Amino acid sequence: MKQILNILPMFIFFIFYKFYDIFIASGSLIVISGLICIIHWILYNEIDKISLFSFLSVFFFGSLTIFFHNSQFIKWKITIIYIIFSLVLLISQFFTRKPMIQRFLEKDIKISNIYWRKINFIWSLFFLFCAILNIYIAYYFSETIWVNFKVFGFTSLTFFLILITSIYINCKISKNK
């Protein structure tokens, strides 16, 4: 349920963009992200950090997009978020006892710390790659291509890395048995 709630805003944004424009889509993104925080609160008695961070970034960049009537703000949102994710993972890689990915998944997955560090580093590089790719697509392609890639391209890339990570983890779990 949480995963569906977390990806719903992206598809609402896409639908509103297709029927209206980037500015109405940005407004819809702000509204649906706020509603998701409320739904999280009602269902789970808490708002998880990712949903709150997502709402605050959508509110900030979406509001700037609408207020200045400039789509560059919403285009930069995803780049900045990816850079933040990359930096958080990278900082946890070198300056904390456990990498961030391990903190999220170690309750369910038991593998050596060295493998967690490799996975964490790969995901940090992935987010940096996505940030650069987003800038490239936003500036060298049409807005429609950017929206389509934002929704379907980044989702596909993320699912692909999740699949590769799962296979890698499964191999390491099998070796530990």
UniProtKB/Swiss-Prot annotation:
It is a multi-pass membrane protein. HAMAP family: YciB (MF_00189). GO terms for cellular component: plasma membrane. Belongs to the YciB family. The chain crosses the membrane at residues 22-42, 50-70, 76-96, 121-141, 149-169. Plays a role in cell envelope biogenesis, maintenance of cell envelope integrity and membrane homeostasis. This is Inner membrane-spanning protein YciB. Pfam families: IspA. It comes from Buchnera aphidicola subsp. Acyrthosiphon pisum (strain 5A). The keyword Cell membrane applies. InterPro entries: YciB. Disulfide bonds: none annotated. Keywords: Cell inner membrane, Cell membrane, Membrane, Transmembrane, Transmembrane helix. It is found in: Cell inner membrane.
